[in-house]
Amino acid sequence: IKVILDGVYSHTGSNSLYFDRNRTFGGNGAFCTRQSPYYNWYTFYEWPANYHSWWNFDTLPTVNKMHPDFIRYIITDEDSVVAHWMKLGADGFRLDVADELPDEFIQLLRQRIKGINPDALLLGEVWEDASTKIAYDRRRSYFTAGELDSVMNYPFRTAIIDYVRGHDGGKALK
């Protein structure tokens, strides 16, 4: 059995330790104090209540993925999130909304994961054809730059389901 963890690095929950909108974790989150060690992870338009969120869901504040503090915490520190779980035996990560992560972030993540375990899997959630994906006016290099080992193949999944249900007369599989 292999253990693949779901890495959500584009946003956090509004009630996470890092944001703590409901003050569940003692009020040290970015929503509670500008002195929070996590404050720079987020973009506030008018602190605290007006902030950038994933697809405008206020329960999912977006993270500044390339902020040095976030990079250290997630990837590069000795006991970063990635290193911690890899050392405990995780066999890799599935990247939630990989198309919303900068290529540079994915490259750093891959270097760290493969540095700990060269056989670890880095799998991306990409809803469209990942080989031709353009996100934020930029062609993604998931495969051409070797960023990801694989992706969730939703177009193929849809074709199989449509075929089994008899919805496309087999066109998707030709």
Describe the residue ranges of each PLM region.
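N-terminal structural segment of carbohydrate-active enzymes
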Residues: 1-2, 12, 17-20, 72, ...
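Glycine-rich, aromatic-flanked loop segments that form ligand/cofactor-binding clefts
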Residues: 1-12, 32-44, 123
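A structural motif corresponding to the C-terminal end of an alpha-helix
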Residues: 1-3, 84-91
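Active-site-proximal helices and loops of the catalytic beta/alpha 8
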Residues: 10-11, 16-26, 81-83, 91-174
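Core domains of carbohydrate- and sulfate-ester-processing enzymes
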Residues: 17-64, 157-174
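A residue-identity detector for tryptophan
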Residues: 41, 47, 54-55, 70, ...
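Active-site cleft segment of glycoside hydrolase catalytic domains centered on the general acid/base Glu
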Residues: 51-71, 98, 102-110
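Short, acidic/polar
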Residues: 67-87
